[in-house]
Amino acid sequence: RVEVLRGPASVLYGSNAMGGVINIVTRKQQEEGVKNNMQVGYGSYNTLQTEFSNRVKKGCFSSVVTGSYNRTDGHRPDMEFEQYGGYAKLGYNFSTFWKVWGDINVTHFNASNPGTVQTPLFDNDSRITRGMTSFALENHYEKTSGTLSFFYNWGRHKINDGYGTGEEPIDDRFN
């Protein structure tokens, strides 16, 4: 489930939530056992979308692991896109009042931009990897609740924003 909250929400989500918040509530296994799910879709322009998920709940332990692969040739030459993604979340309930969890999300994609039909671009490619990890300790009592959370975001972007046809990329543009 995705919640979009417009306007300042710094009281609930921290001082950087001045313009709004996108809160992604991940699915978790409610009943005991293991649940697997796989989705595959194929369409025009050699477009492929895949996702696999595994959810586990055993006693106080829970986990979610997902992986995805998406690609397309695009509707024009030199407009390819390819994406790999992975997500893992582990949780443990110490009691009915206290739980701890941690997760990691990593996505890598390769994309090509051919420019406009009137002004084509050559070798305008991007290779981007983004990641996020978090850890939380939560408590929920009848009249009070609280969470101590830590977040870390990171990324590596390699973007070739254009150079002359047949020339090598300029080092300071490709980092």
How would you describe each model-predicted region?
Residues 1-4, 12, 16-39, 50-53:
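N-terminal periplasmic accessory domains that precede
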Residues 2, 22, 36-40, 65-67, ...:
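Membrane-embedded beta-strand positions of outer-membrane beta-barrel proteins
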Residues 5, 25, 53-57, 66, ...:
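Transmembrane beta-barrel domains of outer membrane proteins
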Residues 7, 25, 39-45, 68-70, ...:
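Outer-membrane beta-barrel pore domains and translocons
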Residues 31-33, 47, 58-61, 95-97, ...:
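Strand-connecting loop/turn motifs
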